[in-house]
Each structure stands twice: as structure tokens, then as C-alpha cells.
Amino acid sequence: MPFPLNRTDTALVISPSEFRIIGIFISICCIIGVLGNLLIIIVFAKRRSVRRPINFFVLNLAVSDLIVALLGYPMTAASAFSNRWIFDNIGCKIYAFLCFNSGVISIMTHAALSFCRYIIICQYGYRKKITQTTVLRTLFSIWSFAMFWTLSPLFGWSSYVIEVVPVSCSVNWYGHGLGDVSYTISVIVAVYVFPLSIIVFSYGMILQEKVCKDSRKNGIRAQQRYTPRFIQDIEQRVTFISFLMMAAFMVAWTPYAIMSALAIGSFNVENSFAALPTLFAKASCAYNPFIYAFTNANFRDTVVEIMAPWTTRRVGVSTLPWPQVTYYPRRRTSAVNTTDIEFPDDNIFIVNSSVNGPTVKREKIVQRNPINVRLGIKIEPRDSRAATENTFTADFSVI
């Protein structure tokens, strides 16, 4: 016997073909979400170099997305192919709790990650405050924040019910009781408007920093200092990734927030378009790994190593042009060179760069103003017998 809807007045009549389309879409999101987020977790387990404090936000995002993709999406797909919600009331509450909890964690992690990027790029003096302890405390706060909002419906502040498209469960957005309305308004403000403000501020300041730096280049100071082409490419990439991340957040959660706000005023969408906000939100589990992790060279390199260990691995491959830069060995031993690497711009220098012959080594670039990048170095000696001058090519990925 089908589990009855709690609010039959808002349930939509959907054709079997539309149910199948929803089922196929959710199945694809489930497969991509499981594989993509699982790869991120494996990368953290295999490669120590990606375990920088800020990347723990990416790991947190992957864990929460993996949980809902493994446990929640199969329930949605099975219900869609059955043309109705096939699990009981307890299953509805468990599903809604898992998915809503994952959504809140994802939203707040987006906000925390964007603010950390703002500090790293625009507030270099405070960069050292982003330590592993600080990040772990922030993650604990995010999970506690999510637990508060997702446990509240289980204890009487609003409730979990089947959604208007009867293949999933969520908060009773369409409830008109005092508890339902107050909870909906509070969630929209605390879980959407507040983190969205942080994201817009952070990426807006990053863009402003880029625009101001471009303006300074056109002044007198620009005539006295040369900015390498690859640094300009990095800055453009920072701007692009910032817009990409903000757009991904808006696409995933803005339609859902709008529908939830409209539900307060008893506005109902009487066709299958009501399913789109839910589908957009659920798709975020599938594309988050590609936006937040696979734009990072370290992640990509390890994924290539995991997926194709039989191929020749080329570290640091990206779309950025590789500049030719000269380095001069300070001293040479039988196995290792300790080098000073000089760039045309004296704002940039490499700390403790060491190579063992013509091999690949990933190091850090420390730049005082304003972009911080990681450096992948591929040593290409002009003469294997020469000890005075070599060249290397470099690839940069934005932190």
C-alpha cells in the first residue's frame, strides 16, 4: 500500500514518462556523485601534499555528498521508477534528514571555502591564521549548525513530509502552521541568505583585487616592474574559478530557496517544473567534485595515477602556458641539487626547492601580492653535463 501524502492538496500529477526521466537523471547523478566524491577521498588518503588546511573543506564537501549519493539518491531513483514514494514514514524522515543535512553542510562549506580563498588572496597578512586547527573547528561548527536545523523537524519545529513531486521527502515547506512558517523563514535566512552573502562578498572582493591590480599595472608602478605572462594567466584563472564556484552555488540552491519562499505565500507551481529546483539541488553532488577538486592540479594528477597507472604520468599538466625560467644551482652533491630559482618578478621566490636530476618536483611559490599558487616543476637540462645552468617548465594551479 502506498505511503500516503501528508499534504495531498499540493501533490502534482506526473506522467509515467516524466517519472522515468527523473529516475534516469537521479541515477546518473548518483553514479557520478559516488565516483567523483569517492575519488576525492581516495586522493586525500593517497597523497599527503593535498592535505593542506583549506583542502579539508573540499574533503568535507566530498564526504557529505558521498553520504547522500550512496544512501539517499537510490531511494529517489527507486521511487521515481515506481511512480510513487515506495518507503514508509520512517524511511521518509531518514531520507529527508540525510539529504537536508547534506545540503546544509554543502552550503556552509561553500561559504567557508570562499571566505578562506578571500583571506588567502586578498588578506595575505592573515593567511597564517588558516591552520588545520582553525579549519577543523570550522568544520565542527558547520556540522553542529547542520544538525541543529535538520534535527529540529524531528522534534516538532516543522516536519518532514513527501515533496510535491512524490519521489523524495523534505521539510514541510508548504505547511501553513506557525511552526512551519517560522521554520521556513528561519531556514531561508540562516541557511541560504547568510552563506550567500559570505560567498558574494568573498568572490566580489577577489574580483575587486584583480581589477585594482589591473589598474595599478597601467600606472607608473607598472612601468617599473615586469609581471610575467604566467602570473597574468593565474589571475585570470582565479577570476574564472571564482565566478564558476559562485554560479554553481546559485544554480544549485537559488531555485530551491525561491520555491520554498513562494510556498509560504501558498503559491504552487502546478506542473512538472516544480521538480526542477529539487533536481538542480541534487545535481550539485555530481558536479561539486569537478569544480572544487579537479580544477586542482594535485587532485588531477593523483586521479590520473589511480585511473591509469599503466600510462606515463605527467605531473602538473594544465591549460596554462609553461614559461621558460632559468635557475642556478648553489651547490651540487652526488644526488641532490639545492637551488635558488629566480623569476623576472622579484615578488616571487621558491623556498627549499630541491631536484634529483631531470625529475619532477612540486613546490610552493610564495608571492607577497596578491595571488598564492602551487608550482609544478619539470626539469629539462640543456646539457646533462652542465652544472651551471638549466631550464625548467612550470605549471601553476590556484590554491
Curated annotation (Swiss-Prot):
The keyword Glycosyltransferase does not apply. GO terms for molecular function: G protein-coupled receptor activity; photoreceptor activity. Its main location: membrane. Phosphorylated on some or all of the serine and threonine residues present in the C-terminal region. Keywords: Chromophore, Disulfide bond, G-protein coupled receptor, Glycoprotein, Membrane, Phosphoprotein, Photoreceptor protein, Receptor, Retinal protein, Sensory transduction, Transducer, Transmembrane, Transmembrane helix, Vision. Gene3D superfamilies: Rhodopsin 7-helix transmembrane proteins. One of its GO terms (biological process) is phototransduction. Belongs to the G-protein coupled receptor 1 family. Opsin subfamily. This is Rhodopsin, G0-coupled.
